[in-house]
Amino acid sequence: VNAQLQQLKSLVLDARGAVLDNAFAETEGSEYGAHHLTIDGLSVHFRVARTTPKKVGQFVTFWKRATGDQIEPFDVRDDFDRLIVVTWTPKSYGYFEFPKHALSEHGVLTVGTTEGKRGFRVYPEWDEPNNRSGVAAQTWQLNYFSDLSDQI
């Protein structure tokens, strides 16, 4: 279990009495701390977002290996319930807990013939997006965001 997942466990999951089971590192996405686990019986994918030098927000990948060398976005039919994305800076720390339906509604997951995304930007409340798509993304994403900056 990586350090960010361990910190989330101690700050959030333990505090709410949640049971974390079956955590294992995913072979794909290790540079984003990719893990799969269950929390209170829900199937959860976990990622750590990364700061990029030239754009506001943080980037996270969320894809699966298809066949051979091909990768593809997760599909609404895939068996999972949540995606948790930790985001942090030297002064701030928080996480997004996206339910599957929100990822589907906002084009992250493949639905039918509409292909989802292999990665996307997250915009915690301390970021100020400087374009319309960033503002729109932050607007829906903040519904699933918890700021823990005062606890670190």
Regions found by a protein language model. Name each.
Residues Y32-A34, D79-L83, S92-Y93, K117-G119:
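Short, surface-exposed beta-edge/turn micro-motifs
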Residues S104-Q151:
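Helix-rich interaction surfaces within compact, conserved domain-sized segments
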Residues L20-D78:
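Short, well-structured hydrophobic secondary-structure segments
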